[in-house]
């Protein structure tokens, strides 16, 4: 499927599409990512980091069609002039589905696996109007979901969204307690940040 999409978008050329992938990653600020194919299959010169992958995922999440696809538990493909029966397509992210690995607030994500890279998982979750993305790499089938859940639990348990300025020319934000570090910020409209504990 990925090669078919690549040929279509790349004007018949998979390599042209891969060039677009690398250009887009660079434009997003990814500094440790290089693609060699559209599928993610192993190549010594095909690599990324958890940070870059989170950056790419967050950009993709801005697309409402992408959000709908990754958040859909299953899709029933109707009969066609070629197939005379319905086909079920199931989401592989078990944090989205009902069962022991379900995670409340999960919005979907993308699973991945190769023998070289191991299990990878990119997942979005939202609670109390705060959305987090979690990326686990080189994990195992046994622990990829529990590791992701633990990271989400830590994030939701220790951080919250805070509006630090709204229609103000300048405000001071204390980043560390006891005046250890503060920062003057100016924004044209509003800026929200995630704060840890009671440090504002």
Model regions: which residues?
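Active-site-adjacent loops and short helices of periplasmic peptidoglycan-processing enzymes
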Residues: 1-51, 57-64, 68
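Domain-terminus/edge residues, biased toward the C-terminal soluble/receptor-binding domains
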Residues: 30-31, 44-200
